[in-house]
Amino acid sequence: MREPTFLVLAALAGGRKHGYGLIADAKQLSDERVTLGVGTLYAVLDRLAEQGLVAEAGEEVVDGRHRRYYELTDAGLTALEAQIERLESTAAKARKSLAARVSTRPAGGIA
C-alpha cells in the first residue's frame, strides 16, 4: 500500500471527512512530510471507493462551498488494520537488524 493511500485510510479512521480535512489530517499524520495534492487525493479516493474500502458519506454546502464527505467501510477498516500490522512488523525487524549492526561495531570504529 502506498503512503498516500495509507494516510487517507488512517485519516478516515477518526470518522467521516471531506477532502480538505483529509489533506490536513494526512499532513498532520505524516508530521508534515506529506502534503497530498487535490488530484492525488481524489485519485486515491476514487480507487479506494472502487475497491470498496471507502464510501461517500453525504454532502453539504458550507459557506457557499460544496463538500463531499467520505468514510471507511468495514473492508477499509480491515485493510487499514492489516497495513498497520505489516508496518509494525517491518519496523520491528528493521529495529532488530539495526540493533544487531550496532552491537557488532568495533569500539570507536565504523563497521
Located regions from the model:
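N-terminal helix-turn-helix DNA-binding core of bacterial DNA-binding proteins
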Residues: M1-T40
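A cross-family signal for key residues in well-ordered alpha-helices
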Residues: A10, A24, D46, E81, ...
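Basic amphipathic alpha-helical segments that dock to polyanions
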Residues: L41-L48
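Glycine-centered, phosphate/nucleic-acid-interacting loop/turn motifs that mediate DNA/RNA or nucleotide
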Residues: G52
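Short beta-strand "wing" residues that participate in macromolecule-binding interfaces
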Residues: E56
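Basic, amphipathic "hinge/linker" alpha-helix immediately C-terminal to the N-terminal HTH DNA-binding motif
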Residues: V61-I84
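Amphipathic alpha-helical dimerization/coiled-coil segments
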Residues: T78-A111
